[in-house]
Amino acid sequence: MLRFKELYQQKIIENLQKNFSYKNKHEIPQIKKIVINMGVGEATADSKVINNAVNDLTLISGQKPVVTLARKSIATFKLRENMKIGCKVTLRKDRMYDFLERLVIVALPRVKEFRGFSYKSFDGKGNFTFGLKEQIVFPEINYDKIDTIRGMDITIVTSAKTDQESKFLLSGFNLPFYN
């Protein structure tokens, strides 16, 4: 059922062990969690917009997201403290592998003019962050039922100590990289 989890356990661990020669099996990098964040700037004007974003993120992730609140007021953005401005969901264990599989196999091939991810998206500690400009690349989202096209930020948090280990780990899951 979870092909990516089996792929990690059977092939990727073995390849990481060969290339980086870890002394302990607990040193081998793994994906800890995937965080999907959807910022909704229009929510300052219309509070109903946040409900549509929550519904979209629920369909995409299979888990109910948490609504994020503004930490402080910013007058130029017409933003008040504790105003709803987005939503996020944290995926772990089986749901994480399920989402990663749908992302790589179904969603990324549907992105227009997608060449791959840049290696510059790593943060120096083995975590990888990228953005998608539209939520309709996921098959769970019905194009006719959405109000506007929204983007999202996806962060893949790994236990890798370096970006090189993390690149090798994510390349094993067939995440496309260029340069």
From Swiss-Prot:
Stated family: Belongs to the universal ribosomal protein uL5 family.
SUPFAM superfamilies linked to this entry: RL5-like
Gene Ontology CC entries for this record: ribonucleoprotein complex; ribosome
InterPro entries in the record: Ribosomal_uL5 (IPR002132), Ribosomal_uL5_bac-type (IPR020930), Ribosomal_uL5_C (IPR031309), Ribosomal_uL5_CS (IPR020929), Ribosomal_uL5_dom_sf (IPR022803), Ribosomal_uL5_N (IPR031310)
Biological role: This is one of the proteins that bind and probably mediate the attachment of the 5S RNA into the large ribosomal subunit, where it forms part of the central protuberance. In the 70S ribosome it contacts protein S13 of the 30S subunit (bridge B1b), connecting the 2 subunits; this bridge is implicated in subunit movement. Contacts the P site tRNA; the 5S rRNA and some of its associated proteins might help stabilize positioning of ribosome-bound tRNAs.
Residues passing through the membrane, by range: none
Lineage: Bacteria, Pseudomonadati, Pseudomonadota, Alphaproteobacteria, Rickettsiales
Domain of life: Bacteria
Endpoints of the signal sequence: none
Any GO BP: translation
Quaternary structure and interacting proteins, as annotated: Part of the 50S ribosomal subunit; part of the 5S rRNA/L5/L18/L25 subcomplex. Contacts the 5S rRNA and the P site tRNA. Forms a bridge to the 30S subunit in the 70S ribosome.
Record GO terms (molecular function): rRNA binding; structural constituent of ribosome; tRNA binding
Gene: rplE
Protein name: Large ribosomal subunit protein uL5
Alphabetic keyword roster: Ribonucleoprotein, Ribosomal protein, RNA-binding, rRNA-binding, tRNA-binding
